[in-house]
Design a protein with these regions (language model features):
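Basic, Lys/Arg-enriched alpha-helical interface segments
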Residues: 1-62, 74-78, 89-93
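NAD-dependent ADP-ribosyltransferases
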Residues: 68
Length: 93
């Protein structure tokens, strides 16, 4: 069964950033490649990692220097995209 992708308001705000002049390219990759891949298998892939010590369970997808964070609702089969940021800023609390 495939998962549905939901972009939270915070994630949409994060997507408004410039991404070092690569915004258009990153958005295209997210929607054309990453989302279809996550919809099928959100926990498996070389660019996917489960974050330790996060509650609720949080995952990240890496595209170059940028990190895209998401949570999975298994019962409803929904992936909530929650944040996007440069790797230098991404893990600061």
């Amino acid at each position: 069964m495939t998962y549905r992708i939901f972009e939270t308001d915070g994630f949409k705000d994060d997507l408004a950033q410039d991404f070092g002049g690569r915004r258009k390219k990153i958005l295209l990759k997210l929607r054309a490649y990453v989302y279809p891949k996550l919809a099928i298998q959100p926990r498996l892939g070389s660019n996917i990692r489960k974050l330790r010590n996060y509650s609720p369970e949080t995952w990240r997808y890496r595209i170059g220097e940028y990190r895209f964070f998401y949570q999975i609702d298994e019962q409803k089969k929904i992936i909530f995209m929650i944040a996007a940021d440069h790797r230098k800023q991404a893990y600061r609390k």
